[in-house]
């Protein structure tokens, strides 16, 4: 999502999705992470499960916030472009290039907004799996 200089490039939706896919690796591998780091009853004395669960929870929250910020930043940038194109279309409605570009940007904006729904599902699934494995070891802070 972020280029080496720290700026987001939201112009190409395919790249946007590819970067989100990479950013969702922690969620995709949550079950594996829990299985390899949270001990079963027979190994509970060898590993501090509460510390492990806390660290995993913090990593999850950091990833969720990072993706949420990235998606919302791209939505804001694309919304701004759509607004500018609407103004151009209002001034010169016969310019087909502007009309086509506006449709393209509106479609991209709609797809980016749908990523927020995907993000909600991914986050809920990860937190559910986390809670099932770590509920006896770590209780996350409540959000007010």
From Swiss-Prot:
Keyword Manganese: no
Annotated source species: Salmo salar
Gene label: mix23
Keyword Kinase: no
One Pfam entry name: MIX23
Chain ranges passing through the membrane: none
GO cellular component, one term: mitochondrial intermembrane space
Organism taxonomic ancestry: Eukaryota, Metazoa, Chordata, Craniata, Vertebrata
Protein name in UniProt: Protein MIX23
Coiled-coil ranges (or none): 82-120
